[in-house]
Regions:
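An N-terminally biased module of ancient metal coordination in phosphate/nucleic-acid-related enzymes
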Residues: 2-109
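Long, hydrophobic, well-ordered secondary-structure blocks that form the structural core
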Residues: 118-133, 154-164, 176
């Protein structure tokens, strides 16, 4: 009687990854970074999509990414007065527009193939300036972004981790958050307990309470949280992202990882 041998094959499942928090910028615009320092290589060198995709070729497969603003230079007062203080952030939105439509300037390090990877992006916004100014800014941001990139705006960010106490609790800030909720846009919140202390966490909790107070559930702003919590010699970083939401994907992606505590950290 002949024997048969059945070979078993192991199929490695694919786990497509969406990188929910990346920062990139072209060399031609590093001078607009608010944290630019000629002695800091991170702010003087270009960080392009060509470099990013080259570094993400190994499994699991990269399905796409969400781009977050890189803290371009801005001024709230002149922005509120005539929009001139928004030049840096709007320049960044125009760069993302070029990524979305596959029209890079020479040397920017991206091409048409990168457009499909852009799942969403989170520009800067002048939250402390209040709802009326925020409405003007969002309209201008969408105008600069154009149709293709504009539909990929998933939320906005205003860095509070280096701001004085009370910033998150200002009337204008809270009204700006409520506007984002009405517009179905998220707010990206960076809390730096590592450098700032416990008060940032406490103020963030109060901020969420005020932003949701008296607001229907359907219009409550969704908060995307990135936290930096101190550990000896290491920094615990946890991000909870709800930027990329589709019918066939869970509503939250979470990230938890350890980094050696840096002496300087970019946004």
């Amino acid at each position: 009687m002949a024997s048969t041998t059945t070979e078993s094959t192991t199929v490695t499942p694919k786990y497509p990854i969406i990188d929910s928090h990346i920062h990139l910028y072209p060399a031609s615009e590093v001078h607009t970074l608010a944290w630019f320092d000629p002695d800091l290589p991170l702010s003087t060198n270009q960080h392009s999509l060509d470099e990013y995709t080259a570094a993400t070729t190994s499994p699991p497969e990269l399905e796409g990414f969400v781009f977050l603003e890189t803290d371009r230079e801005h001024d709230l007062d002149s922005g509120e007065a005539d929009g001139s203080g928004w030049a840096g952030p709007l320049m960044e939105i125009d760069w993302i527009r070029r990524v979305a439509v596959g029209e890079p300037k020479e040397g920017e390090g991206h091409d048409e193939s990168h457009s499909k990877l852009l799942q969403g992006f989170v520009p800067w916004a002048p939250l402390p300036s209040g709802a009326a100014v925020m409405e003007r800014y969002i309209e201008k941001a969408r105008e600069v972004a154009g149709e293709e990139a504009g539909k990929r705006i998933s939320g906005f960010r205003y860095l509070v981790q280096s701001k004085p106490k009370g910033t998150m609790l200002g009337e204008g800030f809270i009204e700006g958050l409520k506007l984002l909720g009405r517009e179905k846009l998220t707010f990206d919140l960076g809390v730096d307990q590592h450098s700032g202390g416990d008060w940032q966490l406490e103020e963030a909790v109060e901020m969420v309470k005020l932003a949701h107070e008296g607001v229907d559930d359907a219009q409550k702003v969704r908060i995307v949280i990135s936290m930096y919590i101190p550990f000896p010699r290491y920094l615990l970083c946890m991000g909870i992202s709800a930027h990329v939401l589709t019918s066939n994907r869970p509503p939250l992606q979470t990230r938890l990882f350890l980094l050696r505590s840096p002496t300087r950290r970019a946004p």
